[in-house]
Every structure is written in structure tokens, then in C-alpha cells.
Regions:
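Short acidic low-complexity segments
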Residues: 63-75, 408-416
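C-terminal helical cap/extension that packs against the catalytic core
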Residues: 367-422
Length: 449
């Protein structure tokens, strides 16, 4: 679905001094807040609760309200709201047609019209790959702007307004067909997998949405041809690729070696999992097309420590390691469990919080198959993310051999205490508030051991 233009980025930059962001605590909205703040705007916002992200933004002099009654409409303020935010709860609901009230996709559409945009999309891996690409550019003294929905060690929240402000590296989200409303000059596609089918209705529609954004990209397109759906696409556009085939511009020899034009290059990285090596190959390819040598990219990658909540190591106590991950799709859970099991000496315990009733219903059997790869899995109640419950859809439906349902996250630390031993690891995984659980488990085990 295309989004109609309200005003251009030049008008935004020249007409407003104040920006107010609704849902500012989310990773996607906080990156816009940081970008706009660095661009010279007075930025404020609203969120339901305090978090690591809101605390970080407040430390950067961004004022945040936690009471809806604090929000009042001002014609001289630009409002940007998350698609997950319910505007009807505010007095802005009657102003949604106003030029100064934009959804996140509408804002990004305007922003991409006046920049050279390097977009990164794909069902899986787009946040990590966008962050890696931004790091490669910055490590090589290319101070470009970027917006992505994650937190990194190299620059915190994933938003930056660079001195080379005509180039924007952007995570291009396929949800709600957002990426097809953007103007993209260079595009990297990591993969296509079944997701967001509550919106697209079927997989074919999702594939066609990816095909459209590829065909409409102005310049370079880089595809992962190890992904079957990308490989099957019939395209009129010239593409560059990375894959395990020597027909690609970047060939993945194994998990630690890539090749280009007959020369092999060693990858040195702290990131866990073969899927990250694939993302690295894609980032190297599109950086190369933008004038950064493979050697210079690899040097940057060596100093990249990843994105928060991507197989993130939180700490250990009594030989028990705790990890946290954002994965909320069966494929993401599968690859993360597989990667960690290689590194864990003992047993791997996984605590999963399903994200949205529609996704849980859609992928129930696949979630089970992924979770059964752990030595033991625990599932807690579904994180709704603004959705209403669907009758008959519950985390309890995921119970199986070695998959235990525990309704409340608060009961998980004490349950695990009776299970885990030195050498074991615990992975908390999901896109909701389960990210709060890992530190609680670590603290509980530390106090009780």
C-alpha cells in the first residue's frame, strides 16, 4: 500500500523546530528521535513506561512524557507516531490528516525523497546488517546518516545525523509494505520468509512486495541467493549477489572465509552463527559498490560487537551463562539456538515469549519445531503488542516434550534454579518485554548460589 505525500523533507527541516514522537521508547521510534535531535530539532515524546531506551534518550536531553494527558496538539510541532501506537487515546486523533501529524512510514517516505538512500531489508537479519553497514561506513571515515531499530555498542541507539547528511543508511521494513513507499537508491535484501501474513494474506503477496521494492530501486541491488525465494525471483533488473555459489560477486566459502574475483578473505568477528556470516557478506558487497574496499570492510567488521539483543551475552554466574535475543519468528529462533548450542558446553535452556497472537497462530507448529532443538524450553504468555486476544490462541498450545508452559515470567528464575548447572546456558528470546527477564535470572541465580 503506497502512502500519499503530505510534505517534503525540505519542508520538514525548514518549517518545524519542535518534534514530538509517540511511542518513543520503541527501537524504531527512538532511532528517529536521536536522528532528529542531532539534526538540530527540539525533540520530545511519549511512551507508556520507562526503559533502558527512554533513560538513554533522557540523558541526551530529550524530554519524555509518561502520561497521555500531557500531550496537547500544537500546529507548530511535527508529530511522528508509531504504527503500533493508538492515536485515539490522545487529542491528536482528530488531526491525523494534518500535515504535521505523520506516521513513521509517512515520515520515512518524506525523508528518503531528499537523500541518497542505502536500504537494507529482509525478513531476518535486516537490523543487524543495517547496523553493521553503518559501522563499516563510519569506521572508514564516511560520516553518513543512519536509522535502524537496534542498539549497538559503537553508537548506542540506532539513529545518527551525519555530516555527510545526503547519504542515509536505512533499515527498510517490509511490515505493512512500508518499504514500497520509500525512495531507495541502493538495496540489500537478506532473505524472504513467511511473516506478516495477517497483513499480506498470503506468501505470494509478500514475495511480490519484495519484488516490487527490488524493481523500483534506482541503482544497485544486492541479493542473498542462498535464499530460495530470492533465487527464484524473475527480475528485469541487474543484480549483484552473495551466496555459496562462485557465480556470485561475493562467494561464501565457509563460515570464516569469503571470496571475490578469485581472492579469498578471512572474516574475523565476535558475532555468533553462520547467519551472521551471511549478513557480513551482504554488507561487504554493498559497501564495495559504494567505494569501500573489502579489506577496509573486514577491518571494520573485526571491531564490530553486534547489536543489543542479538544473541547478546548478559553475563554469567557459577558457570551459567545468560543470553538474550530479539528473535520472534521460528527461523530466527532456530538459527539462534543452533548457533548457541555450538558454543555451550552443557545444556541450553530457552525461555520464549511469543510476540502477537496472529504470529503465534500462524507459526504454531514451526515454533514447536524450533524450540525442540533446545535441551529444554519454557514458554510464557504471549506479548500482544497492541493486538486483541484470539480465542483459542495461547502459549499453552506450544507445550510439548521438553517444552513447558509457565504463565508468569516472575516464576521462571526460581524454576531454572532447580535445573541449571555449571556449563549450562539460558537464552531468553522474543520481541516483547522478555528482555527484562535475563538480568533478573542472572541476579536471582547469583544471589541463590
Amino acid at each position: 500500500m503506497m502512502i500519499y505525500l503530505k510534505l517534503s523533507a525540505k519542508v520538514i527541516m525548514n518549517s518545524y523546530k519542535n518534534v514530538y514522537i509517540l511511542g518513543i521508547g520503541g527501537t524504531g521510534m527512538s532511532s528517529i528521535a536521536k536522528y532528529m535531535s542531532q539534526a538540530g530539532f527540539n525533540v520530545g515524546g511519549y511512551d507508556q513506561r520507562k526503559s533502558y531506551i527512554t533513560n538513554t534518550l533522557e540523558q541526551e536531553s530529550i524530554n519524555i512524557d509518561f502520561d497521555l494527558e500531557e500531550i496537547t496538539y500544537d500546529k507548530d510541532t511535527l508529530y511522528i507516531y508509531s504504527t503500533a501506537f493508538n492515536l485515539t487515546k490522545t487529542n491528536l486523533s482528530s488531526n491525523t490528516e494534518s500535515k504535521n501529524v505523520l506516521s513513521r512510514p509517512e515520515f520515512l517516505q518524506e525523508l528518503t525523497r531528499d537523500n541518497y538512500v542505502i536500504g537494507v531489508t529482509g525478513t531476518h537479519g535486516k537490523t543487524s546488517t543495517t547496523a553493521l553497514l553503518a559501522h563499516i561506513f563510519h569506521y572508514n571515515k564516511r560520516n553518513v546518516s543512519y536509522i535502524f531499530g537496534g542498539v549497538t555498542s559503537f553508537n548506542g541507539i540506532g539513529g545518527h545525523y551525519g555530516s555527510d547528511n545526503k547519504v542515509l543508511i536505512l533499515e527498510a521494513d517490509e511490515a505493512f509494505d512500508t518499504f514500497n513507499s520509500l525512495h531507495i537508491d541502493d538495496l540489500l535484501v537478506t532473505n524472504i520468509d513467511e511473516d506478516h501474513l495477517d497483513y499480506y494474506l498470503n506468501f505470494e503477496n509478500l514475495i511480490n512486495a519484495f519484488k516490487n521494492v527490488i524493481e523500483n530501486t534506482s541503482n544497485n541491488v544486492v541479493l542473498n541467493l542462498d535464499n530460495l525465494e530470492l533465487k527464484k525471483l524473475k527480475l528485469s533488473k541487474k543484480i549483484y549477489s552473495y551466496s555459496s555459489s562462485d557465480e556470485s560477486e561475493i562467494t561464501i566459502i565457509n563460515s570464516g572465509v569469503i571470496s571475490h574475483e578469485g581472492t579469498n578473505f578471512q572474516i574475523e568477528t565476535s558475532m555468533i552463527g553462520d547467519h551472521f556470516k551471511s549478513n557480513i557478506a551482504g554488507a561487504i558487497c554493498i559497501a564495495y559498490l559504494n567505494g569501500i574496499s573489502i579489506e577496509d570492510s573486514l577491518l571494520a567488521i573485526k571491531h564490530f560487537s553486534g547489536v543489543r539483543r542479538r544473541a547478546e551475552f548478559l553475563g554469567s554466574t557459577s558457570g551459567i551463562s545468560i543470553y538474550d535475543d530479539y528473535g520472534h519468528h521460528p527461523t530466527e529462533i532456530d538459527v539462534t539456538i543452533t548457533a548457541l548450542k555450538i558454543h555451550v558446553k552443557g545444556k541450553l535452556y530457552v525461555v520464549f515469549q511469543p510476540h502477537r497472537y496472529t504470529r503465534t497462530q500462524e507459526h504454531l507448529d514451526k515454533f514447536k519445531m524450533s524450540l525442540l532443538k533446545a535441551d529444554e524450553a519454557i514458554v510464557v504468555d504471549i506479548y500482544p503488542s497492541g493486538e486483541l486476544p484470539i480465542p483459542g490462541v495461547s502459549s499453552k498450545n506450544l507445550e510439548d516434550k521438553n517444552i513447558k508452559y509457565i504463565k508468569s515470567m516472575r516464576a521462571v528464575p526460581s524454576y531454572l534454579r532447580g535445573k541449571v548447572n555449571s556449563g549450562d546456558a539460558v537464552l531468553t528470546i522474543g520481541a516483547g518485554d522478555i528482555t527484562l527477564l535475563g538480568p533478573q535470572i542472572l541476579k536471582y541465580l547469583d544471589e541463590k548460589n
